[in-house]
Amino acid sequence: MYLALGGYTALCQLVGGSGRKDISCPIPLIYPVGWWYNKKKTGEGSMISTKGRYSIRILLDLAANGGEKYIPMKEVAARQEISLKYIEKLTPVLKSAGFVESAHGIGGGYRLTRKPEAYTLWEILQLAEGDLTPVSCLHEDGSVTCCRAPHCRTLPVWQRFYTMTREYFSGITLADLLQDPEKPL
């Protein structure tokens, strides 16, 4: 929602069943709100959700073990130690985005639709996570929707953070991850 800075107030919009309501709200803490600040019950932060991490692992497993043949998700689940039920929730999303294709029956399963070097971690994370911008006022197309933008001292920080994150994950492909023979898939 907003970057909260101690001692300030912000104009917030509450959205509910009765519509929108503008309120002035005190902001007592400093914390960034966005995709990388998802608090777990244990109090630890999380940058990428399980959906994002598992989507990468599924595609990486198919890249390493499939080639042209179809791989049953049961095998991927066993190798990756991921619940088959959870994988079955992710594969339709991967299929509808054109990342994988499937075949039914004997010899069926899933396989990649492109070569491993054609999949970047950024596009996989975008598919699995949705909007990857670190704050709600910044959008993936670079536009900003915040009345404070003209005088916001923190906006350039979030813009640079988003750019660095996008460039970093865009520079890593599934093929790159396959190159480390020391680590098991």
Predicted regions and their residues:
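Key DNA-contact positions within bacterial/archaeal DNA-binding proteins
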Residues: 85
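Short amphipathic alpha-helical interface segments
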Residues: 55-67
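Non-DNA-binding regulatory cores of transcription-related proteins
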Residues: 113-185
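Basic amphipathic alpha-helical segments that dock to polyanions
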Residues: 90-95
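Short, Lys/Arg-enriched N-terminal segments with co-localized hydrophobic residues
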Residues: 21-46
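A short alpha-helical element within helix-turn-helix/winged-helix DNA-binding domains
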Residues: 71-80
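Beta-hairpin "wing" of winged helix-turn-helix
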Residues: 99-106, 111
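Short alpha-helical segments that sit at the start of domains
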Residues: 44-58
